[in-house]
């Protein structure tokens, strides 16, 4: 590893950080309420350098797509945004991640509280099979010991925002595992929304879904972005073009993953500045 300050597990040190030299902050929108920003992020798994000098702004209340070939560090970067990489043995990180201007790796940060603000939806739907649909939505509240006066209203609100209420309102007491794959993924989105996050991280949320279910999830993503910041990893270029406002193209060319280019999605897909970006979005490799 290099001389950048390393952060591993619960032993976090933010006295010195790598300065962002090769980063490509998105050029539209401002980091503000519900906004994210990274500066000079490096990640290692033991001695393997996975990400190098990732500096990126995520404009508030919009969708940022992370695109690039498999193995370039997109999902790892997503984990860094709410410190989920700390669950992986041998993981180490250097750099800074800001949520609403506050460094989430600073000493004394309440990691559990931070993760309530930065929710996550995984690649495969993962409802709790032993719980009903309603219990699944409210599970996060119970785990975080958050008291809610009107659970019925919150349940309807979250399922409505996830585009699922009309489909399940008459069977809230049936198992979450009884739903179709697409419905299960929207149930997981509703579960993430119940704790009122400012940011939602989505790691290929449609990769296991059929086209019709994918469309419904995409519609949900676009609607949610009106009042929250969404970061989505996708290998589907058509999906990236449909749902994201901005894109960052990651690439690993025999070394750690870096950002080749980041800009408005319309620019990335029509007039990218780097030929490697053009080759990727046009399907010449990856």
What residue ranges belong to the model's regions?
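Short helical segment in ABC ATPase nucleotide-binding domains corresponding to the A-loop/adjacent helical element
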Residues: 82, 133-143, 152, 156
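ABC ATPase NBD coupling module
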Residues: 90-92, 103-119, 143, 268-272
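Conserved ABC ATPase "signature" region
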Residues: 96-103, 149-170
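Conserved ABC ATPase signature
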Residues: 173-179, 183
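Conserved catalytic motifs of ABC-family nucleotide-binding domains
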Residues: 196
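Catalytic Walker B motif of ABC-type/P-loop ATPase nucleotide-binding domains
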Residues: 200-203
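Conserved beta-strand-loop-alpha-helix hinge in the C-terminal portion
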Residues: 252-282
């Amino acid at each position: 590893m290099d001389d950048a300050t390393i952060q591993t597990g619960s032993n976090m040190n933010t006295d010195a950080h790598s300065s962002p030299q090769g980063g490509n902050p998105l050029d539209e929108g401002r980091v503000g309420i519900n906004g994210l920003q990274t500066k000079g992020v490096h990640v290692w798994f033991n001695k393997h350098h996975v990400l190098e000098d990732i500096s990126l702004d995520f404009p508030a209340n919009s969708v940022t797509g992370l695109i690039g070939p498999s193995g370039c560090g997109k999902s790892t970067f997503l984990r860094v945004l709410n410190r989920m990489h700390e669950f992986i043995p041998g993981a180490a990180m250097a750099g800074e991640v800001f949520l609403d201007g506050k460094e989430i790796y600073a000493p004394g940060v309440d990691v559990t509280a931070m993760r309530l603000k930065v929710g996550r939806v995984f690649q495969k739907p993962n409802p709790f099979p032993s719980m009903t649909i309603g219990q699944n939505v409210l599970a996060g509240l119970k785990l975080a010991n958050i008291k809610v006066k009107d659970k019925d209203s919150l349940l309807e609100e979250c399922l409505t925002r996830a585009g699922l209420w009309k489909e399940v309102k008459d069977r809230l007491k049936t198992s979450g595992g009884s739903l179709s794959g697409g419905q299960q993924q929207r149930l997981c989105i509703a579960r993430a929304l119940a704790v009122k996050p400012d940011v939602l991280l989505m790691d290929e949320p449609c990769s296991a879904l059929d086209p019709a279910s994918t469309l419904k999830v995409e519609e949900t993503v676009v609607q949610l972005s009106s009042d929250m910041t969404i970061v989505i990893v996708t290998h589907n270029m058509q999906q990236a073009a449909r749902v994201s406002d901005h894109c960052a193209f990651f690439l690993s060319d025999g070394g750690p993953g870096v950002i080749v280019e980041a800009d408005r999605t319309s620019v990335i897909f029509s007039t990218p500045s780097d030929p490697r970006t053009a080759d990727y979005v046009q399907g010449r490799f990856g």
